[in-house]
A protein has these predicted regions:
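ABC ATPase NBD Q-loop/coupling interface
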Residues: 77-97
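Conserved ABC ATPase signature
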Residues: 158-162
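Helix-to-loop junction immediately C-terminal to a conserved catalytic motif
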Residues: 68
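Conserved ABC ATPase "signature" region
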Residues: 125, 137-154
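Hydrophobic anchor residue at the start of the ABC signature
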Residues: 172
Length: 263
């Protein structure tokens, strides 16, 4: 059985979408404790590389989880347009298709099952086998992922032997197992030094994938080699700026300055 059954089946010669369009229509999310993670937001995201910046608690993670279907909006709607198909990431009927379409990266978090495997190659193999990917395809994909993400020399090492930098890379590899069209990444370089950040960022943006990611690293989003197309600045669960990365960083700097002046 190939990796894309149904909507994105490779057996019916339907290719993986080159990109998707996320649409939020008056979407909001309120947590059980009453805190609003995202206020009513109307937004369309279809650029190749979109950065989301903001202070802790500004709503970045809430927004990304609404995009990848981990959260369902309290009000309003979130949809994903992939070719001629429209999916609702928070709905039960579209959940499997959304999981095939979107790869989720959460910092350096990897599935718990990876720590029970003898080594990371076997961990990736088991992860794909559980999703009914054929053996030949699994082996080809494992080799490709490990090479692309500079993990080949670690293939026979257990996950808990990896340093933080390579766990970040392994988290990306895990997210790519189903050959998704888009990666939604929450702080994919968090906690790394300058060298580690550059290594992970180069690997992430070298992939032939649409990427929506949250970060505190304003230098990274303006580096020309990463070709970030667009940046959103969030504050208090609201989008305060939507435009070029350079202008977003300026808006972010001004926001922090105003907060300090009020303190």
């Amino acid at each position: 059985m190939d990796i894309f059954s149904g909507l994105f089946s490779r057996r019916d010669n339907t290719p993986r979408p080159d990109h998707v369009t996320f649409t939020l229509a008056q979407a909001s999310y309120t947590y059980e404790d009453g805190n609003t993670g995202l206020h009513d937001t109307t937004l369309t995201l279809d650029t190749r590389r979109t950065a989301v910046i903001g202070l802790n608690g500004s709503g970045k993670t809430t927004l990304l989880k609404l995009l990848d279907g981990s959260l369902t909006p309290t009000s309003g709607s979130v949809t994903i347009c992939a070719g001629e198909h429209t999916l609702y990431p928070g709905s039960c009927k579209d959940r499997k298709r959304v999981e095939q379409l979107i790869g989720c990266v959460r910092r350096e978090e990897i599935p718990n099952s990876f720590y029970r495997s003898e080594n990371i190659a076997k961990a990736l193999d088991a992860h794909m086998q559980a999703r009914h990917i054929a053996d030949a395809e699994r082996q080809a994909r494992i080799g490709s992922l490990l090479a692309q993400l500079d993990l080949s020399v670690w293939r026979d090492r257990p996950a808990d032997a990896l340093d933080s930098e390579h766990r970040h890379l392994l988290a990306i590899a895990a997210a790519l197992c189903l050959d998704p069209a888009v990666l939604v990444a929450d702080e994919p370089t968090k906690g790394l030094d300058e060298i580690g950040t550059a290594h992970v960022a180069r690997a992430l943006f070298a992939l032939d994938r649409q990427v929506v990611f949250a970060t505190h690293d304003t230098d990274m989003i303006t580096r020309p080699e990463y070709a970030i197309d667009r940046a959103l600045l969030l504050d208090g669960g609201r989008i305060m700026f939507n435009g070029s990365p350079q202008d977003a960083v300026t808006a972010y700097t001004n926001l922090i300055r105003r907060m300090r002046d009020r303190a």
